[in-house]
């Protein structure tokens, strides 16, 4: 399996050796990132975006890559994250297969793919790697740090590990720890991959590839990324046309089944299964409460920033809205002027990607006031 690196990616060589939180280290590792806008002379207009598990660093198009990005409607000139004003950096997470060093990368020491020899990955490792990029660009303090989904966890880790790195923070559909439901879902996703005989303890290749396992894992993910409300309105119980079905017992019959199958089919050859395992587990392990003797609100209160916005969707079952409320409350206890906003978007966890009409205005208003 190979990495999937967007054209126009930039790369930062991490300090070597790069120590990992749970032990081990990386040698000659790198982080992929992309930028938009221009850094001002005082280097005070920078925004860092930390993405979720599967996205690359290509959040929006730019001169080196004209393809629309995964947050195209949110980022650009005159958009909520206005690149006419801000210098924006988006980092591909350490452990991914989209340009940053991960299990699908080659170990420069052994000249073989890391696979399961990659050190245990924590959210904190991605946080430390991202800040190396920020410092390499000559930025001492970010105007704002934005994290969505898994990136919301990474952003909190950055703020805990690197005090004074940002003046403000926007946490979008993120959390300060993984809840049992989310851990259970991700556990099933990892099990589906590992039970595929082609996974072969991580030693698969393009000929013998755990496609079935990764496809099931992705389907489970998609179900949790959206909401029952959206499924009802979008698909109902509508069945497929006869030319879309076959005579296979228990085969696809409903449109919702076909949607999941199509979505999973597109995903399986654009993401490495071992990387999926590592990143998924890192989310389960993350817990802000570890920074304050088991008290999650006290852990959040250790963060020192001027302003924050925690925003999410009431239909999110993967990162429930209570978790964004918790982030805002904890930050307030530490003296941050923190605002919480819950939206009625029907798209569940993925709402921040598609409901720009809902998420865009509060993000724009927050940044405009900085």
UniProtKB/Swiss-Prot annotation:
Superkingdom classification of source: Bacteria
The family this protein is said to belong to: Belongs to the AB hydrolase superfamily. MetX family.
Classification via Pfam families: Abhydrolase_1
Protein's UniProt name: Serine O-succinyltransferase
Important for substrate specificity: annotated span: 52-55
Job of this protein: Transfers a succinyl group from succinyl-CoA to L-serine, forming succinyl-L-serine.
Principal location class: cytoplasm
Database matches in PANTHER family: HOMOSERINE O-ACETYLTRANSFERASE
Record InterPro entries: AB_hydrolase_1, AB_hydrolase_fold, HAT_MetX-like
Protein's cellular compartments: Cytoplasm
Organism expressing this protein natively: Xylella fastidiosa (strain 9a5c)
Any one of the GO CC terms: cytoplasm
EC number(s) reported in the record: 2.3.1.-
Active site: 149 (nucleophile), 316, 349
Pathway: Amino-acid biosynthesis; L-cysteine biosynthesis; L-cysteine from L-serine: step 1/2
